[in-house]
Structure formats: C-alpha cells, structure tokens
Regions:
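Acidic/histidine-rich catalytic neighborhood of metal-dependent amide-processing enzymes
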Residues: 71-130
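A non-catalytic alpha/beta surface segment that caps or lines the substrate-entry region
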Residues: 2-56
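Active-site beta-strand-loop-beta-strand hairpin of nuclease catalytic cores
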Residues: 58-63
Length: 130
C-alpha cells in the first residue's frame, strides 16, 4: 500500500474505525506490533490503545512516534494520519536496511497526551539512543 492509500484508509471520523484502520495497515504491511492498553478513566472514557512496533534489533535505537487519534468529529488527515503514514513507510525502510529503530503510535493525544504519557511511564530508557 502507498502513503496516499494509507492516508485515505486512516482518515476516519469515528475513533474506533480509525483504530481499526491502523491495525489493518500494520497487518497489511507485515509490521509486527504489540498493543499497550490502559483501562478507561474519567479523563479518557475510551481508554488508551497504543500500538508499538516490535523492535527488529536489540540494539539501543531512536524512537519515532505519532498519535493516530484526531479531534472529535474530524477525519484527522493532517492531525495526524499523515504523520502515521510517513512513520509506517520509514519503519519499513529502516527495517529493510537493518537500522535499529522503535516506533510508537499513540492514542489519546487530543485528550491531553494521555497515550504518550502512558507509554513513557513504562518506558525502558536504556533501549533508546535518542
């Protein structure tokens, strides 16, 4: 799939459809991932679902991230499906070239960076070089 086709697929008004579209794209592109989930809360009634690509190298690496949620009621093409598409392409390229990297796609950015805060709370910083 190309970036423009990914973008059309990811630009969804409904948050559940957007999340499913991201899942579809990661599977179609053969990128292994894990799901980091946080239960729903008063601040974020949907809970958090971060998608973390499985590192292809045990070496310390750079971390690339983007949020996949969008302002409620919008398609989120600029904010932030475009960045997600670019990072998926970058992940494929770096993996093919055996360049160590980590990728995270965060939920809950529009609700106060909830997904990235949740991710950082359990991050092993020794696995990163920057």
């Amino acid at each position: 799939m190309t970036i423009d086709r990914h973008l059309k697929h990811l630009a969804q008004k409904d948050p559940e459809n957007r999340q499913k579209a991201l899942l579809d794209v990661l599977i179609q592109e053969g990128l292994e991932f894990s799901l980091q989930e946080q239960e729903p809360s008063i601040q974020n009634p949907r809970g958090i679902r971060n998608y973390l690509l499985t590192p292809w190298s045990p070496e310390p690496s750079l971390l690339f991230c983007a949020h996949y949620d969008a302002v409620p009621g919008t398609f989120g093409a600029n904010d932030n499906a475009a960045a997600v598409c670019i990072l998926i392409q970058l992940a494929q390229t770096l993996k093919k070239e055996h360049i160590p990297a980590r990728f995270a796609f965060f939920d809950g950015e529009e609700a106060g960076n909830m997904g990235s805060k949740f991710y950082v709370s359990s991050l092993d910083r020794t696995s990163l070089t920057g």
